[in-house]
Amino acid sequence: MIESFAPIYDKNCRVLILGSCPSVQSLAKGEYYGNRQNRFWRVMFRLLGEEYSDDYSVKTGMLLRHGVALWDTIGSCARQGSLDSAIKDVRPNDVAALIRDGGVRCVALNGGKAKAVFRQQVDADVVFLPSTSPANARMDFETLFSVWQKALSPYLY
């Protein structure tokens, strides 16, 4: 069974971005979006107006400084490889419990599997975003960034 990471969260977060489940590369590195081909970190650095860094503590610190939390919809599952289509035996994370007493106003779902697993259980706006995964190669970076920027800007600034 694959176990998700602990959330990156504090009570000042206004946006919670939910993925599905860590990839093989992410699990090996012990980091969210650890596959260098995944565009999540490039999107977030640009969206938040910060200079890109490969340092994971810089990445997570940037999110929290800007009121962005990060977690997965799936708490544990079985999966061969990294593709979301191979996920089975899902136990969802309790998103409502995480943000019950915080200031999250928007839950953003990164990709189709996150959307499929998530159950509207929170008092917040919910937005569906195209996946930053390399499996979503049909969407170029500029288009992907534009969609994310349009959806999240009202909650970040």
What are these regions (language model features)?
Residues 3-14, 35-36, 81-96, 116-157:
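C-terminal capping/extension of enzyme domains
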Residues 16, 69-71, 108, 127:
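Hydrophobic/aromatic beta-strand patches that form the interior of the parallel beta-sheet core
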Residues 20, 109-113:
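Short, well-ordered beta-to-alpha junction loops that form the rim of enzyme active sites
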Residues 20, 73-75, 130-131:
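Short loop/turn segments at strand-loop or loop-helix junctions that form parts
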Residues 25-86:
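Short, surface-exposed acidic-centric catalytic microdomains
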